[in-house]
Swiss-Prot record:
It comes from Psychromonas ingrahamii (strain DSM 17664 / CCUG 51855 / 37). The gene is rimK. Mn(2+) 1 binds at D248, E260. Mn(2+) 2 binds at E260, N262. Mg(2+) 2 binds at E260, N262. This is Probable alpha-L-glutamate ligase. Mg(2+) 1 binds at D248, E260. Belongs to the RimK family. Keywords: ATP-binding, Ligase, Magnesium, Manganese, Metal-binding, Nucleotide-binding, Protein biosynthesis. The keyword Transport does not apply. It comes from the Bacteria.
Amino acid sequence: MKIVILSRNKSLYSTRRLKEEGEARGHQIDIIDTLHCYMDITSSRPTVRYQGEELPVYDALIPRIGASVTFYGTAVARQFEVMGTFNINESVAISRSRDKLRSMQLLSRKGIGMPRTGFASKPDNIKDLIKNVGGAPVVIKLLEGTQGIGVVLAETAKTAESIIEAFMGIKANILVQEFIKEAGGADIRCLVIGGKVVAAMKRQGAEGEFRSNLHRGGSAVVVKLTKIERETAVNAAKIMGLNFCGVDLLRSESGPKVMEVNSSPGLEGIETATGKNIAGMVFEFLEKNMKAEHSNKTRGRG
């Protein structure tokens, strides 16, 4: 198959692993810088151009779109979709998962466990907002934050009010969430491919750090999931419409709580922690689905 990977940096671990694994399985793998693509949106003949040339119609697309380029990246992915390329994660699903508020509203509607969460725009709602999620301590998150950036733990109601007022003062959109103390600064990353959890790791925050992101000095070990944790991860991926994603869970006294569904999960941490060939599993999914009827190809439904 001819497969295109959208990535800003071909030297990143995940991009390199996908290219190596794809070529080892006999596929043609092209890595294209998302922001250097441009589109010809012509009636009946949509194309993507790159470095002065028209790109071919690929069999499949693996989008590695960073949060900072979500708008343009999903536009490029959507252009490939209307050309008839099978996208492992449809552009609309990526957009859905990147909007933290929208994704939580969708998960909430389907009864997925989540930390109690509040959202507001006016300062006069702050006291009740904090009270409504259970009171301090609370976690305050920027809607646009990634890798633990823009996430603050407020230990007291007064501190929480000050932080929320400061964010509102700069017109930032924020979520206010209950703090799951029993999680102990750890979360679980479930890697879901094709409706199955294929690997899972427990990420522990560095000493004195409540955020468990590996980018912030956290560590990771393989973990065994409970049945309900596995089902929660699979259902969250399905609700987002993602075939390949990372679902982050917290273990709480009332069951697993979904923190985020990541449409472009990194492979280095989970391959290292579990010893599993995740990149190979991505291609197994593509090969199986590309053998199905052409009606399965994504066409960009909005």
